[in-house]
Amino acid sequence: MSRVCELTGVSVQSGHNVSHSQRKTKRKFLPNLQNVSLFSDSLKKAFKFKVVARAIRTLDKVGGLDCYLLSASDKILSKFAIEVKKIIKNNGSKSS
């Protein structure tokens, strides 16, 4: 099970716990991943994604799943998100 956000690409980071005596021990910073169903307005359908809490806030700010996917770069999106993006693009071109 991979700990990567499907919409933003945020993943596990590594660092140190630092004690009072300045000893450093390795640790991991885990992303705040949530399993959510996101609704596509153009397709009238919900899709399940594993996303970080910050991405959910960004989706609300941008105006929904469709707007976010169309403006996002394919480099940061997962394979499933890219497929959904293509479906949304094709659906938009048919309705125009």
Curated annotation (Swiss-Prot):
Q: Which family, according to UniProt?
A: Belongs to the bacterial ribosomal protein bL28 family.
- Which UniProt key words apply to this protein? Ribonucleoprotein, Ribosomal protein
Record-level Gene Ontology MF annotations: structural constituent of ribosome
A GO CC annotation given for this chain: cytosolic large ribosomal subunit
Q: From which domain of life does this come?
A: Bacteria
Q: What name goes with this protein?
A: Large ribosomal subunit protein bL28
Keyword Transcription regulation in annotation: no
Can you supply a Gene Ontology BP term from the record? translation
Q: Which PANTHER family match?
A: 39S RIBOSOMAL PROTEIN L28, MITOCHONDRIAL, LARGE RIBOSOMAL SUBUNIT PROTEIN BL28M
